[in-house]
Amino acid sequence: MSAPPPLQIREANAHLAAVHRRAAELERRLLAAERTIGAQAERLACHDQHLRAALDELGRAKDREISALQEQLLSSEATVRSLQAAVDQRDQMIQQLQPRADLLQDITRHRPPLAALLATLEEAEELGPLPASHSHRAQLLPDGPGPPLGNNMGKEEGQDDQDDQQPAVFGTTV
């Protein structure tokens, strides 16, 4: 075999040098890409870790808020039960006091006529006792029984309409 011509050797050497440069360039680019991918993977892992931590914290915050709301709900329910018991107790008290309130209303409704009656009775007491009657000779002392009283309705004595008259009745009830 014969040796290749020098031109071919130079061309082959130039080609090999170009291939070598290209391979070195590709290795540099590969290393740079690997470093970039590694850095990106590290950043993504760190970001993923931060997101997981944030998600875990959100879950814990949600659980705390749910727990606080459950406690608040239980407290509110206890307050409602307490207030309902107070309302029921007051309703019972109202039912117990209602007859007395009705009685007091009746008393206040009858108060003006009763006051007028008492004023009239005081006026009658101021008139004093009746003088002794000749026909009855009754005792008119304050502690003793007095003569019977009858209503005088403006009729003369001796009229025959005695059936229309009703005797006056005085008394008090307690």
Curated annotation (Swiss-Prot):
Keywords: Coiled coil, Cytoplasm. It is found in: Cytoplasm. One of its GO terms (cellular component) is cytoplasm. Residues 128-174 are annotated as: Disordered. The keyword Coiled coil applies. Its main location: cytoplasm. Residues 7-97 form a coiled coil. This is Vimentin-type intermediate filament-associated coiled-coil protein. The gene is Vmac.
